[in-house]
Regions:
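Conserved catalytic core of the tyrosine transesterase superfamily
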Residues: 1-316
């Protein structure tokens, strides 16, 4: 077994990383191997220098035109592999020391405005009233993410047994294989019960009887299929811009913050290990306040009336 395969097995067993995370690690390492003109199995790690890593990052950024966040993720995958190899005696020097990440702009999370989200929920009512399991399933996908804030990978990995008997909570497996319990709305619990009833009465489970969300082939749905469902439903009611499961997750967190939820409570629900990851939503709230200030403050209106030439210090 080659070094990379052993590293991934260790990550699965010791770090309890999800299959999706492990695939991402392998893909990033394979990308580096291809750039070197070899495979993961034939990478000669002892003959790789710091400059090789820096040249690869330059290639990704300047030739491939990848975003800084993508380049940094790929670097992080290789850096984690290298630390593991150092600890297990597969390499003798730390070439990653001194290799810096690319600077990334701090982008505010994209979310669906509350009024537009009401349109989405209203549009789902006909699906929820249907006896067509696939229409009910699609509505359930949207509502599970929007009302619980779970990640795409967490949704796809759900099993029937993860739903509490009363359908008022769900256990999800987050990053680092960390479990957390998410509350579910009573109305959503009724939808889940209906979905269960349709699913088992029609006996559509073929290969994966445990999986909660199924494809039309009767097996566990994949991430891309969920993305298509979300995109179709959101664009169908006129939601502009990005329409991904992660946008629904951002919408969940943004609405909680706007309704006065504590930041640490939101952190727990989202499964963020670091509060700083959750604090980005406070920046969003500050941006909203700033916009409201510019629209409503009387001195701001005075400034607009004067063409922006007035000495503000004399009028405050």
């Amino acid at each position: 077994m080659d070094v990379v395969s052993r590293f991934l097995l260790w990550m699965e067993a010791e770090r309890r990383y999800s299959p999706l995370t492990l695939r991402n690690y392998r893909r990033d390492i394979e990308e580096f191997a291809r750039w070197r003109g070899v495979t993961c199995a034939t990478l000669d790690f002892e003959n790789i220098a710091r400059k090789d890593i820096q040249d690869w990052l330059y290639y990704l950024s300047d030739r491939r035109k990848l975003k800084a966040s993508t380049v940094n993720r790929m670097l992080a995958s290789l850096r984690t592999l290298w630390r593991w190899m150092l600890a297990h005696g597969h390499v003798s020097k730390d070439i990653m020391h001194g290799v810096r990440q690319y600077k990334t702009p701090r982008a505010l999370p994209i979310f669906v405005p509350d009024t537009r989200m009401r349109d989405v929920v209203e549009e789902l009512r006909s699906d929820l009233a249907s006896e067509d399991i696939w229409r009910v399933r699609d509505a359930l996908i949207i509502l599970l993410i929007y009302t619980s804030g779970m990640r795409l990978a967490e949704l796809v990995a759900l099993n029937d047994e993860d739903i509490a008997a009363d359908c008022r909570s769900v256990v999800v497996m987050g990053k680092g294989r960390k479990e957390r319990v998410l509350p579910l709305l009573a109305s959503l619990g009724k939808i889940i019960k209906k979905y269960f009833s349709l699913k088992y009465s029609q006996n559509i489970c073929i290969a994966e009887k445990k999986a909660l969300i199924l494809s039309k082939k009767g097996v566990r749905i994949n991430c891309r299929a969920v993305q298509r469902v979300v995109e179709q439903k959101l664009k169908g009611v006129g939601v502009a811009g990005r329409t991904s499961p992660h946008v629904l997750r951002h919408t969940f967190a943004t609405q909680l913050l706007n309704e006065g939820a504590d930041l640490r409570e939101i952190q727990e629900l989202l499964g963020h290990s670091d509060l700083r990851a959750t604090q980005i939503y406070t920046h969003l709230d500050i941006a909203k306040l700033r916009d409201a200030y510019h629209k409503a403050h009387p001195r701001e209106r005075d400034d607009e009336d004067s063409g922006g030439t007035r000495d503000d210090s004399a009028h405050i």
